[in-house]
Amino acid sequence: MEYLAKNKNTYFLGQATVFPGTAMFNTLKDINNSKKIELPVAEEMQMGMTLGFMLDGKTPISIYPRFNFLLSSINQLVNHLDKFKEMTGGKNSKAIIRTSIGSIIPLHPQCQHVGDFSKEIKSLCKNINVVKLDNPKKIFNEYKKALNRKDNISTILIEYGDFYNSK
């Protein structure tokens, strides 16, 4: 995340960006708080803010700690983020959506926190790059690629929560 934070146009928004609460917080703790926006549990609002950052020419990294939570923003994701270039006449801006398939180790959080909706999101969003980070060695390169895309296609990067405990 430090690599992404070095870019003057990036901002991190979501739950547990400024205050601890998820495993993802530890990946953001060394990033200056001026680059982070802590949000309440309001996923659709968060996606709307993500779009607002894009309209302002910024590259938001919008963090949804669990894939299941991202579902609450599906309207904005499918109807606005996926159609962003068409709706804005080709505005050159992109977002990075960071989410995770919830960990089951050391404690299983139950079915509402461990969903993998990769295939479904790919079928709904034809203009968003959807990447499952199933190998820890791919993680940095995929984030770097998402940030540096010249075509300004937004990317959803799907992490595995258990990697925080085992890799």
Where are these regions (language model features)?
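Thiamine diphosphate
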Residues: 1-166
